C-alpha cells in the first residue's frame, strides 16, 4: 500500500508508515507521476484536489490535515467513490491565540484596553466559539454572526452582520469560503462593509483570503480610512498584493493555525480516519508525539492584568516574528510558500506552565488555555 503525504505534515512519515509505504511529496504542486501507483493522498490547504488531479488514478482515499476544505472537490470525490476526511478544529486553538497575540500587540501600541472593546466574531465554528469563550472569560463583550447556524436554530445569540459592523470595535472573520449560494462568503467584507466600520476599528482575517475583498480594502486604506488591519490570508495566494501588505498593521503568510500542536492534531486526525477506512483502526495520543516545551515554568505574582497577559502571550508567540519576514520577501516568487515550509516551531499557550500566587489569576489563566496552578506565597 503506497501512501503519499505532504512533506510538511509533521509526524506523517512515522504515523502512516504503520499502515503502508510512505512517500513524502511537495504539496504545491503534487508530482503527478507519483499518483500513478498510490493508494492514498494526504494533503494540506496548498493542494487543489479535484478531478483534474485524480481522474484515472488509483487513489482510494484523500485526507486533508486542515480544518478548511475549500481546496477539495468533495462532490467529485464522492462521485468517484474516493474516501475523504478532513481535520475539523485541528488548528482552532492556534488561530485563537494568533488573534490574541495580534490584539494585545495593537492594544499596547495604540494604548487602549481590550476590556473596553466589543469584538464581533463572524463565523462561530471551532475557531469562533473558542475565541468567544476566551474573550468572555476576560469579561470582553462579544457579538456573534453566523447565518447558517442561526437558520438551523443552533444555540447562540446571533446578530446580523450589519449590526456587528455598526457596533463592533473589532471585527474578526472565521468563516469557510463559499463562492456562491445563500451563505456566500466570497468578498463578505466588501467595500461597502469596510467603509461602514467604526472609525478606528480593527479588521482581522484569519480564515480565507477572498472573504475580504483585498482590492476594496486597499482602496479604503489608500483613501485614509482610519482602520487597523490584521491579515494572515490573502486573495491569490501564494501571490499577494504587496501594496496592501505595506498598508496593513500585521501581515503574515497564512500561518495563524501553524502551531506544532495544531499541525500534529491535523496529522493524527487524518491518520485515524484512514486507519479506520482500511479496517485497521488506530488511535494516537497527541502528547506521545510532541516534544517537551522549551519554556519550562515561570512564576507569576499578583493578579492578571492586560500588560501581564500580553507578556505571557508573547512569551509563547509574538505575531511580529511572522510579520517582519513576510515584508522582507513579499513579491519575490516562491518566498511566501518558503516561509510556510520553513516555519519556526511555535507552541500553544498550554505549553507554558505558570505558577501563580493569586488564585484568581491561576483560574483565569486555565480558562484561557494556559497550564496554570495556584501556589500561595509563603
From Swiss-Prot:
Into which EC class is this enzyme placed?
oxidoreductase
Catalytic activity, per the record?
4-phospho-D-erythronate + NAD(+) = (R)-3-hydroxy-2-oxo-4-phosphooxybutanoate + NADH + H(+)
Q: Where is the active site?
A: 208, 237, 254 (proton donor)
Q: Where in the cell is it found?
A: Cytoplasm
Task: List the CDD domains.
Answer: ErythrP_dh (cd12158)
Asked if the Swiss-Prot or TrEMBL record annotates the protein with the keyword Transcription, the reply is no
Assembly behavior: Homodimer.
Role this protein plays: Catalyzes the oxidation of erythronate-4-phosphate to 3-hydroxy-2-oxo-4-phosphonooxybutanoate.
Q: What is this protein called?
A: Erythronate-4-phosphate dehydrogenase
Q: Which organism is it from?
A: Escherichia coli (strain ATCC 8739 / DSM 1576 / NBRC 3972 / NCIMB 8545 / WDCM 00012 / Crooks)
* Source organism phylogeny: Bacteria, Pseudomonadati, Pseudomonadota, Gammaproteobacteria, Enterobacterales
Amino acid at each position: 500500500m503506497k501512501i503519499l503525504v505532504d512533506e510538511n505534515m509533521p509526524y506523517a512519515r512515522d504515523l502512516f508508515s504503520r499502515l503502508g509505504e510512505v512517500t513524502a511529496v511537495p504539496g504545491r504542486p503534487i508530482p503527478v507521476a507519483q499518483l500513478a501507483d498510490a493508494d492514498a493522498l494526504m494533503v494540506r490547504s496548498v493542494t487543489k484536489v479535484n478531478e483534474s488531479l485524480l481522474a484515472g488514478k488509483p487513489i482510494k482515499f484523500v485526507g486533508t490535515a486542515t480544518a478548511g476544505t475549500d481546496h477539495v472537490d468533495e462532490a467529485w470525490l464522492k462521485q468517484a467513490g474516493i474516501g475523504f476526511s478532513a481535520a475539523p478544529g485541528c488548528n482552532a486553538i492556534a488561530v485563537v491565540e494568533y488573534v490574541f497575540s495580534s490584539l494585545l500587540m495593537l492594544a499596547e501600541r495604540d494604548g487602549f484596553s481590550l476590556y473596553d472593546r466589543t469584538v464581533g466574531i463572524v463565523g462561530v465554528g471551532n475557531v469562533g466559539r473558542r475565541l468567544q469563550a476566551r474573550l468572555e472569560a476576560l469579561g470582553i463583550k462579544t457579538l456573534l454572526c453566523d447565518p447558517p447556524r442561526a437558520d438551523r436554530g443552533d444555540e447562540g445569540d446571533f446578530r446580523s452582520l450589519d449590526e456587528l459592523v455598526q457596533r463592533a470595535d473589532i471585527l474578526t472573520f472565521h468563516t469557510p469560503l463559499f463562492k456562491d449560494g445563500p451563505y456566500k462568503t466570497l468578498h463578505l467584507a466588501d467595500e461597502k462593509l469596510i467603509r461602514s466600520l467604526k472609525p478606528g476599528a480593527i479588521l482581522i482575517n484569519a480564515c480565507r483570503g477572498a472573504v475580504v475583498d483585498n482590492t476594496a480594502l486597499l482602496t479604503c486604506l489608500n483613501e485614509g480610512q482610519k482602520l487597523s488591519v490584521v491579515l494572515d490570508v490573502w486573495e491569490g495566494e501564494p501571490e499577494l498584493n504587496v501594496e496592501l501588505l505595506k498598508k496593513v498593521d500585521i501581515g503574515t503568510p497564512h500561518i495563524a493555525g501553524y502551531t506544532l500542536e495544531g499541525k500534529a492534531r491535523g496529522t493524527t486526525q487524518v491518520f485515524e480516519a484512514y486507519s479506520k477506512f482500511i479496517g485497521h483502526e488506530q488511535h494516537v495520543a497527541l502528547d506521545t508525539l510532541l516534544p517537551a516545551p522549551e519554556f519550562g515554568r515561570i512564576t507569576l505574582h499578583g493578579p492578571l492584568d492586560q500588560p501581564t497577559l500580553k507578556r505571557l502571550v508573547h512569551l509563547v508567540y509574538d505575531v511580529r516574528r511572522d510579520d517582519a519576514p513576510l515584508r522582507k520577501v513579499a513579491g519575490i516568487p516562491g518566498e511566501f510558500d518558503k516561509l510556510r515550509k520553513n516555519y519556526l516551531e511555535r507552541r500553544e499557550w498550554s505549553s507554558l506552565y505558570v505558577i501563580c500566587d493569586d488564585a484568581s489569576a491561576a483560574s483565569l489563566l486555565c480558562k484561557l488555555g494556559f497550564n496554570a496552578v495556584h501556589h500561595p506565597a509563603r
